[in-house]
């Protein structure tokens, strides 16, 4: 019974809110007697899985029937409604109206920005709604609704209504498994699933063995999207409401400077490594008709999660570096970005789209006329309990070799693929050097570390090392509050963005190992200061003197836009530093 006791102790130690619930989708398991040298778990999922085999032992690497992993959902005959259509078609709006009208429910989105937006919408409609993301918890007394990032969705709570947004992300190599888990596992009478029509055949196949009733509702775009026959031409043709899209930090700031040098426009910027709060603030200033920031320069981060009043999308290029090589944008990527132009009920109801380079126009026009390629497979990833049992069967707590072996042996149906674990394996190699248990290693491997960012990676290593040595990690041992300053160059800006990632990592860990990472409030306040300083840099960088002077008529604007308590902390630290 040693395995049983260990699993139960671990499970008691970590509550549902302390970690993403999908870590323990097998948390309802009952431990049975153990015979011989192998430990068998009499979990409903594994019990059902055994029914698919005639052998006398379980095959933990058999992932061919993932719908049986969620017995609570299988006890229901769910009514599943697929709301599918292009950007700006109203598909998500209709699903959210049903969520508002339900007695209990959950919204599962791909981004914190979307989760926060939905929580605010429901609370404004007098429907108390919690916000739960990897880095945030805002719980409302008496709330029966929650808005969560998809990884945080709870498979054990029963809801009247659940909504999954951007379901086409089941095909994402890195995060698709979280959407698959929500699709198969949410225990809800009604499940409303929103996304691209390209995912419909796959969803229908996946849900067929569940017994759920599936209804598909197709939507058309509410406002026209017009692909232009000519390129932008000169940058002097930039006009208010334009969004120039490019795919690297360097080119974003280069284009921003070039546009502002014309003396007619000031630019907001949005890209992935900006803090979410900064992205929201930049989008708000772009949307504000009283602001002089009437042009947006952005990456594909605008594809989802931000409400933007864009009149025209201008692609500076139709190629991007995907972490491995430069490649052409896919049809789905082009349509997702282009679709942000024009917004029903906004100042720009008709959207336009063009390019800087005339050689790119044929690809742009072809992509907009084409249906998105059908999504063939959905992502899967084993839960911690499965990997824990697998490691015990092989007599090792080294996570990297266990994960590699499991992935090599995993058996899948044609509708699924195993999630891309390249980054996870790199983190596993780091934490395997430390005296940590398997669960802790697994947790660090799931953490939001940017393994391609040196500062972010060093932060993870220090957090893990201090945790392994002392069991408690004080933020001040790694990071000195009061040392942050407004960046003076792009390199310093990038460094500040990386520091923000490290602080976010600390907050993430503090929600899962609360006693060991006790400085959540300090990390959160420093995170807010990072965002403030980045925004101050964006206000200073590249603006023409007259335009900047014109815009900053209210010198206290920055002060007014931040929570007063955060500002007090910030300026107290500045005072201490000056002494």
Swiss-Prot record:
Its main location: nucleus. Residues 1-59 form a transit peptide. Keywords: ATP-binding, Auxin signaling pathway, Cytokinin signaling pathway, Gibberellin signaling pathway, Glycoprotein, Helicase, Hydrolase, Mitochondrion, Mitochondrion nucleoid, Nucleotide-binding, Nucleus, Stress response, Transit peptide. ATP binds at residues 85-92. GO terms for cellular component: mitochondrial degradosome; mitochondrial nucleoid; nucleus. GO terms for molecular function: ATP binding; ATP hydrolysis activity; DNA helicase activity; RNA helicase activity. It is found in: Nucleus; Mitochondrion matrix; Mitochondrion matrix, Mitochondrion nucleoid. InterPro entries: DEXQc_SUV3, Helicase_C-like, P-loop_NTPase, RNA-DNA_Helicase, SUV3_C, Suv3_C_1, Suv3_DEXQc. Induction: Induced in seedlings in response to high levels of salt. Glycans are attached at residue 309. Residues 214-388 form the Helicase C-terminal domain. Gene3D superfamilies: 1.20.272.40, 1.20.58.1080, P-loop containing nucleotide triphosphate hydrolases (3.40.50.300). It catalyses: ATP + H2O = ADP + phosphate + H(+). Its EC number is 3.6.4.13. SUPFAM superfamilies: P-loop containing nucleoside triphosphate hydrolases. PANTHER family: ATP-DEPENDENT RNA AND DNA HELICASE, ATP-DEPENDENT RNA HELICASE SUPV3L1, MITOCHONDRIAL-RELATED. Belongs to the helicase family. Major helicase player in mitochondrial RNA metabolism. Component of the mitochondrial degradosome (mtEXO) complex, that degrades 3' overhang double-stranded RNA with a 3'-to-5' directionality in an ATP-dependent manner. ATPase and ATP-dependent multisubstrate helicase, able to unwind double-stranded (ds) DNA and RNA, and RNA/DNA heteroduplexes in the 5'-to-3' direction. Plays a role in the RNA surveillance system in mitochondria; regulates the stability of mature mRNAs, the removal of aberrantly formed mRNAs and the rapid degradation of non coding processing intermediates. Homodimer; in free form. Component of the mitochondrial degradosome (mtEXO) complex which is a heteropentamer containing 2 copies of SUPV3L1 and 3 copies of PNPT1. This is ATP-dependent RNA helicase SUV3, mitochondrial. It comes from Oryza sativa subsp. japonica (Rice). The gene is SUV3.
């Amino acid at each position: 019974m040693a395995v049983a006791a260990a699993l139960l102790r671990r499970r008691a130690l970590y509550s549902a809110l302390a970690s993403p619930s999908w870590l323990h989708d097998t948390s309802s398991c009952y431990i049975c007697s153990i015979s011989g040298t192998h430990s068998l778990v009499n979990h409903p999922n594994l019990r059902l899985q055994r029914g698919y085999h005639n052998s006398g032992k379980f095959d933990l690497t058999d992932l061919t029937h993932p719908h049986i992993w969620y017995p609570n959902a299988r006890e229901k005959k769910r009514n599943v409604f697929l709301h599918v259509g292009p950007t700006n078609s109203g598909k998500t709006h209709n699903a959210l109206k049903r969520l508002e009208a339900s007695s209990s429910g959950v919204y599962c989105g791909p981004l914190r920005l979307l989760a926060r937006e939905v929580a605010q919408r429901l609370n404004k409609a007098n429907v108390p709604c919690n916000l739960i993301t990897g880095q945030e918890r805002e719980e409302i007394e008496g709330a029966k609704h929650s808005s969560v990032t998809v990884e945080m969705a709870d498979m054990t709570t029963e809801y009247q209504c659940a909504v999954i947004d951007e379901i086409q992300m089941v095909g994402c190599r890195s995060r698709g498994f979280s959407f698959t888990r929500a699709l198969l596992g949410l225990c809800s009478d009604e499940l409303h699933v929103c996304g691209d029509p390209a995912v419909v055949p796959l969803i229908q196949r996946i849900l067929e063995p569940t017994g759920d009733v599936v209804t598909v509702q197709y939507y058309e775009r509410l406002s026209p999207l017009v692909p232009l026959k000519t390129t932008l031409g000169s940058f002097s043709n930039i006009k208010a409401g334009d969004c120039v899209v490019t795919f690297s930090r360097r080119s974003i700031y280069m284009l921003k400077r070039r546009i502002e040098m014309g003396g007619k426009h000031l630019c907001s910027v949005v890209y992935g490594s900006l803090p979410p709060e900064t992205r929201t603030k930049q989008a708000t200033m772009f949307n504000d008709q009283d602001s002089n920031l009437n042009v947006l320069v952005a990456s594909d981060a605008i594809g989802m999660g931000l409400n933007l009043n864009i009149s025209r999308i201008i692609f500076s290029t139709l190629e991007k570096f995907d972490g491995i090589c430069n490649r052409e944008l896919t049809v789905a990527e082009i349509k997702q970005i282009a679709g942000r132009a024009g917004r029903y009920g906004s100042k720009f109801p008709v959207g336009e789209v063009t390019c800087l380079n005339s050689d790119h126009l044929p690809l742009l026009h072809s992509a907009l006329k084409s249906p998105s390629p059908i999504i063939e497979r959905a992502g899967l990833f084993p839960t911690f309990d499965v990997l824990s049992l697998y490691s015990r069967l092989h007599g090792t707590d080294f996570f990297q070799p266990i994960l590699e072996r499991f992935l090599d042996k995993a058996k899948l149906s044609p509708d699924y693929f195993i999630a891309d674990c390249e980054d996870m394996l790199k983190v596993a190699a780091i934490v395997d050097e430390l005296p940590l248990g398997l669960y802790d290693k697994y947790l660090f491997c799931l953490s939001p570390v940017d393994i391609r960012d040196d500062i972010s990676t060093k932060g993870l290593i220090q957090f893990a090392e201090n945790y392994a040595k002392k069991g408690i990690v004080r933020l001040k041992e790694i990071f000195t509050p009061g040392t942050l300053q407004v960046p003076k160059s792009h390199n310093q800006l990038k460094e500040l963005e990386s520091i923000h990632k490290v602080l976010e990592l600390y907050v993430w860990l503090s929600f899962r190992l609360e006693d060991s990472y006790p400085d959540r409030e300090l990390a959160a306040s420093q995170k807010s200061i990072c965002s403030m300083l980045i925004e101050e840099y964006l206000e200073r960088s590249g603006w023409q003197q007259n335009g900047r002077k014109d815009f900053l008529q209210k010198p206290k604007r920055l002060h007014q836009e931040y929570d007063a308590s955060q500002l007090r902390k910030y300026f107290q630290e500045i005072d201490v530093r000056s002494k």
